[in-house]
Amino acid sequence: MSSTRKEIVGAFFWSRFMPEVILSFNDVHKDYLSHSSEWWSKRPLIKAVQGFDLDVEEGDSWGVVGESGCGKSTLAKMVMGLEKPTQGKILFQSHELLNHLSENRTSFYRSVQMVYQHPTASLNPRQTVGQIFQYQIQRMGIDDDEHHSRVCEVLENVHLSEEILDRYPHEFSGGQAQRVCIARALLSKPKLLVLDEPVSALDVSVQAEILKLLDKMRKELGLTYLFISHDLAVVEQICSKTVVMYAGKIVESGPTKKIFKNHKHPYTKLLLESVPVIGKPMESGNKVSVEPIPEDGCPFYPRCSHATESCLELPFSSNDKMDPAHQWRCHHPV
């Protein structure tokens, strides 16, 4: 067999059996102008997201973790078209997301839905669940003859009965309200769900129920998740792959098991050590600094106990030779 024919056959099998990339971030940046107390002074630039690169394959569950202000929710807003990237491109099913939105907004939102952090706040308090679902169905352009069957189907998916259709949001517990929000998101049969801290406002016991439900639906319905969270235990439970962000930049990414058991970046180590454990004494000694974050080097430099002058230069990127999907950006991996 000639080399050209081998390449063609190889490409065929690769495309046939490898999952399709459903969402792709290509060098995405997002900047904001901060508010200034003096009208005459120059407004400083806040770099919320810097050089974000990620390919999300169909059926995957990617977790995006980091402390508050690292750019997680900004990413979610850009995926939903609520914010535009300052630089770079976001592709959905190989088409530029912003073009997709401008050409057919309804089609895009049928494929991409979002579940928010506070379930009750994201539901109209003046409407019953039935009315909320009806509005979503009309908005998504779902055929009239499918209305009842779609509602029954999504309620069954989230383990709720049809009786809740006549109830108002304030009549539900936090867990029930979040199930309603998930059901609403499923009405249009989306391919991608963006979940922004979907269980952080719930009790721990209720969190477990919702996470189990989300994992079950992903496997049964073939959904893809972009899961935004600051809770590492939640991400470990539901996400197959994880991105760790700090100050708008990716510092480590890869399979979730690798991130938790064989992490390389000092910030990932700090995040994992910050999780409280009953009976374990609190450790001190982590470096706290008010130094500005370097523009070119590692953003964690001012707080890192392993930092050297080389960290102020362009960040060093490396990966696990046994598992190239596990990548980190650090000159001195732990």
Residue ranges and their predicted role:
Residues H35, W39, E162, G254-V334:
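Charged, flexible cofactor/metal-binding loops and thiol motifs
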Residues G88-N99:
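Conserved ABC transporter NBD signature motif
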Residues V194, L202, V206-P281:
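P-loop NTP-binding/switch modules centered on Walker-like glycine-rich loops
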Residues D145-E163, L272:
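Conserved ABC ATPase "signature" region
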Residues Y168-F172, Q176:
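Conserved ABC ATPase signature
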Residues M80:
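Helix-to-loop junction immediately C-terminal to a conserved catalytic motif
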Residues L187-K191:
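A short, proline-enriched helix->beta-strand linker immediately N-terminal to the Walker B motif
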